[in-house]
Amino acid sequence: MVVDIDELDNLSAYLQSFTHRVKAVIVNKVKKNTDINMIRSKVNELGLFLIGYLYFDTDFHIESRHLGLYEPQKDIFNIVNKVSDELSKTLNFTMLKDFSVEEPHDTDIATEALNIKQKKYRLAFAYDEAFSFTYEENIKVLEEYGFEIVKFSPIHDKKLPDNIDVLWLSGGYPELYARELSSNTSMLESIYNADIPIIAECGGFIYLHKSFENNEGESFKGVGLIAGKAFKTKKLVRFGYIEIEAGSDSILMKRNQRIRSHEFHYYDSTCNGDYAHAIKANKSKEWDCINAHDNIFAGFPHLYLRGYEFLLQNLISFLEREKDV
């Protein structure tokens, strides 16, 4: 666990509530004149290990960014390199490795994935400047379940890849590339006429709308499979960790199945969907979400497949039924 340390006296009180699920601590923003052994003593008193620390340095500061999320760029790499150099002196990498052992995946799930892997499906996966927010673990799980990943660019390519069975539109910044996406009319038409299962998360969902706004509030033509408009607001909309329950069967979920997810966006839609019901982790808010009809599953929630492999089992069952028709 990484902990910012503003005042040494507050460290023990803060860590106290995490001792049942945290084994080791890395302390961040340490003042240069602080006694590291004193920090180590306070951490050890709680039965935890101090495996590293990072001194406060203005060179490590990262400016605020749209959504708080960063795509690869030169200045970020420079900061990362500086932090890496410092951590090479202050972080016990052996202890970090020892405390970071990954829990083995469920054997039954792994066996089932191997059995399914014999059935190959080609999945077009959007990945470019506008669509770059995805869990790499999702790619791994998709491949385990027999999907051949074919990456493509909604900005630069003229149409979808050939002979694909599924389309996955990941999250990203379509609003920052609205003009480029909208002007690529051949791609819009290719997606609209694809007639294959389409999964769209957040940014991908925005792109599927009949129209969507850019960051300046200008409206642009979208794919048109979601009959509404995605528009910018002045604050975060329905953000946080949530649990989603399906209201009926769809290409990814069956009625009453549940998954955990999250939403994090400044955009809203005139067509958010009511296929599923979402409840925040702290039970403070709840709302309807996701458009799921025919062969579409699209909404603001981000999907994480590891642990929810039944989503792919449902998708494969749908593909098999379509093949038999």
Residue map of PLM features:
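Structural motif
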Residues: 26, 168-170, 298-300
